[in-house]
Design a protein with these regions (language model features):
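Alpha-helical scaffold segments in carbohydrate-active enzymes
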Residues: 5-9, 77, 81, 149-152
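A non-catalytic, helix-rich entry segment at domain boundaries
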Residues: 1-24, 31
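Short linear motifs at secondary-structure transitions and domain/linker junctions
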Residues: 1-2, 17-21, 68-72, 119-124, ...
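Mg2+/Mn2+-dependent nuclease catalytic core
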Residues: 26-122
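Short, surface-exposed helix-loop/turn micro-motifs enriched in polar/charged residues
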Residues: 16-20, 66-70, 87, 135-139
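A generic secondary-structure signal marking the coil-to-beta-strand transition
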Residues: 20-21, 51, 143
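Metal-dependent nuclease catalytic regions and adjoining charged, substrate-binding loops involved
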Residues: 82-185
Length: 185
């Protein structure tokens, strides 16, 4: 019933018979200063003049204006990866919120994507620093109210489990990142 409601809502927002996506579930990847960025774009539309529109579907409701900018990070990330991989900045980023039928559209520019790139590089530098030092400081926010791991979080008096000895290598070495840890003997 819920899936049917979401499909019906999608049909009220877009006429699928008129859509001719260039790509669906498109794997995107680019390297930025040695950092490999990758993800999956729900839908990529390309117009006759080559302009790209990146579309992402969300089953939930659109965020309030207070959180809208952070919800666009994923879309700016996709735009950055496409720009670096294809040499063209997408003209339009579009979030489709099927939960309440809202469309959020954003037109990125080079300055915006360069700022996104700087932010990603700074985040990765912080991850590298934490992996090398073992200093993973929690950041308390309202999202903690929904977290299932508060009992393990130092910010809430919890004790995290010890990291495997090879955790920094597994996190930072691209040749092993994302692979399962070897089984204990």
């Amino acid at each position: 019933a819920e899936a049917e409601r979401l499909v019906h809502r999608w049909f009220t927002l877009e006429d699928p018979a008129r859509l001719e996506p260039a790509e669906r579930e498109l794997f995107v990847e680019a390297e930025v200063d040695g950092l490999v960025l990758r993800g999956y774009v729900d839908r990529l539309d390309v117009s006759a003049d080559g302009a790209m529109r990146v579309v992402d579907y969300k089953t939930g409701r659109s965020p309030s204006e207070l959180f809208e900018r952070s919800s666009l990070f994923q879309m700016r990330f996709y735009a950055l990866v496409l720009w670096r991989a294809r040499g063209v900045i997408p003209r339009m980023l579009q979030l489709v919120y099927l939960g309440n039928g809202e469309l959020v559209r954003y037109e990125p520019d080079e300055a915006d994507l360069l700022a996104t790139e700087r932010g990603i590089k700074a985040l990765w530098a912080a991850i590298e620093r934490a992996a090398r030092t073992g200093d993973w400081r929690p950041r308390v926010s309202r999202l903690c109210d929904w977290c299932e791991h508060r009992d393990l979080c130092p910010a809430w008096g919890g004790t995290p489990p010890p990291l495997p000895l090879d955790a920094p290598t597994r996190a930072l070495d691209p040749s092993v990142a994302g692979q399962a840890a070897p089984a204990d003997d």
